[in-house]
From Swiss-Prot:
Subcellular compartments: Membrane; Cell projection, Cilium
Spans annotated as Disordered: 1-158
Name this protein carries in UniProt: Transmembrane protein 237 homolog
Transmembrane domains' residue ranges: 222-242, 256-276, 301-321, 343-363
CC annotations in GO: ciliary basal body; ciliary transition zone; membrane
Task performed by this protein: Component of the transition zone in primary cilia. Required for ciliogenesis.
Biased composition (Basic and acidic residues): 36-45, 111-135, 144-158
């Protein structure tokens, strides 16, 4: 078959606008270019009839109708704007017009000074210096709404309102004067002590002796308990030191030698101080007073002091073996050192036991507490002469 040629579609029709002058062509050139673009777009979207000639198309021949192009509102606005192309929206921006500086001469300054002197109003004009931008600062009053509106200058400081944050994070209003201790700002008065004595059950003059008396009684009770435990432990240790073999005794006693020695030192010191309180001798004159010495012997104060002093020295002499067992565990102590330790240990047990027996026979031989009580009664006579009030004061002081 001879080759067949496809029909060439006709070129798009163009609307040629004739103008009499070249200036009109330049104005409408842009408009015609836009119309040509729109017309080409429409023609390309139209589907024309296919020729009956034989061709190698895949799809069969179908007649189709041409579909017109639907214009949108935006395109219509463009066409209307193209028709009125002579009207344009122009934006005009005016720059800042520089103002020439005024040149002042000496004559102008003199004239202004003359007018200011002749001004009949007499009002003084406030002259403000220009702020230096490098030093000027802006301070924002952030807490303006947070402050109390009644916080005036003439209001007393104690009546001002402050805001205190609570444990839940919220603030509550409180007066500033609540946190002031007004007693510090009051002038001292002579009648303050008398008023305090009248308000208190125990007079101020008797508070210190009463506290000393109660402290002495508590210490005496604690010392009695410690002396009882010390006597039992020291006797038990003395029995073990003679009944056990040296190797077994030293092996078991090695790890607790220093703690036991420290405990014995504390207990014997407490017992010795308690024995000094029983003697009633606190001044140099008491050693030459026959009455004091007789009372000390009668209360077992002097004998108790000697016993506890010997026990404290015996405890100090035991440190030689106990320190060697603690700091030199590989070194075997000599037999003489072990024998001396046993002797001192027995002496320590005897003194602690004898001191506890002397205390058991006379548990109320606390001379210090008795003298404090007598001093309180003497001061009580100076405070008041009312027997009922004396009884109330003594009951409150727990004497």
């Amino acid at each position: 078959m001879p080759p067949t040629s496809r029909p060439v579609p006709p070129p798009p029709k163009r609307r040629i606008s004739e103008s009499s002058s070249s200036s009109d062509d330049e104005l409408t050139g842009n408009n015609s270019f836009r119309e040509n673009q729109q017309r080409r777009f429409r023609e390309n979207n139209e589907v024309g009839n296919i020729s009956d000639s034989d061709n190698d198309e895949v799809f069969s021949h179908q007649e189709s109708q041409s579909v017109g192009f639907i214009e949108t509102d935006e395109e219509r606005q463009r066409e209307e704007h193209a028709q009125n192309s002579n009207l344009r929206n122009r934006r005009v921006s005016y720059g800042k017009i520089p103002v020439p500086p005024m040149s002042m001469t000496v004559e102008d300054i003199q004239e202004a000074a003359k007018h200011s002197r002749e001004d009949p109003s007499g009002e003084t004009v406030e002259v403000r210096r220009p702020n230096d931008p490098r030093r000027s600062s802006v301070s924002l009053d952030v807490f303006k709404s947070f402050r109390d509106p009644h916080d005036k200058r003439n209001m007393p400081a104690k009546d001002k309102t402050i805001y205190v944050e609570g444990p839940n994070g919220k603030f509550r209003e409180m007066k500033k004067g609540k946190f002031w201790n007004r007693d510090k700002f009051d002038s001292p008065k002579k009648d303050a002590e008398k008023k305090q004595d009248e308000d208190s059950v125990i007079p101020f003059l008797l508070k210190a002796p009463g506290q000393a008396y109660r402290t002495q009684r508590v210490y005496n009770q604690i010392a009695n308990i410690i002396q009882g435990f010390l006597a039992g432990i020291s006797v038990m240790l003395a029995i073990f030191s003679f009944n056990l073999e040296p190797e077994v005794l030293l092996t078991g006693y090695r790890y607790m030698s220093l703690p036991i020695h420290a405990g014995f030192m504390v207990a014997f010191t407490v017992g010795l101080v308690s024995a000094i309180d029983r003697t009633g001798i606190y001044e140099v004159e008491h050693f030459t007073s026959r009455t004091r010495l007789t009372a000390t012997v009668y209360n077992n104060g002097l004998i108790t002091f000697i016993v506890w002093f010997v026990g404290l020295v015996s405890t100090l002499l035991c440190i030689q073996l106990e320190s060697q067992l603690a700091f030199a565990p590989t070194r075997i102590p000599s037999e003489d050192l072990v024998h001396h330790w046993r002797v001192f240990n027995v002496l320590r047990a005897l003194t602690s036991g004898l001191g506890f027996l002397l205390l058991a026979f006379k548990p109320d031989s606390d001379t210090m507490a008795k003298e404090l009580r007598e001093a309180i009664y003497e001061q009580l006579e100076l405070v008041t002469s009312d027997p009922e009030r004396r009884r109330v004061i003594i009951t409150a002081m727990k004497i």
